[in-house]
Amino acid sequence: MDNNSNINERRHVARQLSFALYSASNRVIRLHRPFLEPLGLTYPQFLVMLALYEGTPRTVGEVGQELGMDNGTLTPLLKRLESAGLVTRTRDQQDERRVLIDLTEAGKALREAACSIPEKIETACRLSDEDLAELRDTLNGLAIPRQATPTLHTT
């Protein structure tokens, strides 16, 4: 294989890491839909609810940091969850700048169904427990870099 063929092979979309991640992410999110629709949740709302099931009340900042979402993304999600009667948002009496998120009784009632979904998704992925753990660790390593990201050159 000559050098040009090698370069073209590396450029092929199916060989791109970003395309593999994009395709896998889309598939996994689609796998969630039949489980989330009966709960009235979108995938991002589901992630917020899982974060809240770990303990409440929590600040918007804490949830955003855990999920890697900024306030501009998280606030509309929380407004929709609040409109659905699943969460409440209140100002922290100790620090008015902070907004506390808590589960309502309706939000708590979804806990068992929502918390059973990750296991169903893992089963649908048809990977061994070891492969799932390795994949999760690898993806977390990409999502949460251990050190500063190197400067990318665009030339």
Kindly give the residue locations of the regions a language model identified.
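Charged, amphipathic alpha-helical coiled-coil/dimerization segments
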Residues: 29, 57, 79-137
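Conserved amphipathic alpha-helical interaction elements at protein-protein interfaces in regulatory
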Residues: 34, 38, 54, 80, ...
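N-terminal helix-turn-helix DNA-binding core of bacterial DNA-binding proteins
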Residues: 19-22, 26, 30-70
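Amphipathic alpha-helical linker/stalk segments
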Residues: 124-126, 145-154
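N-terminal leader segment of winged-helix/HTH proteins
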Residues: 1-39, 133, 141-144, 153-155
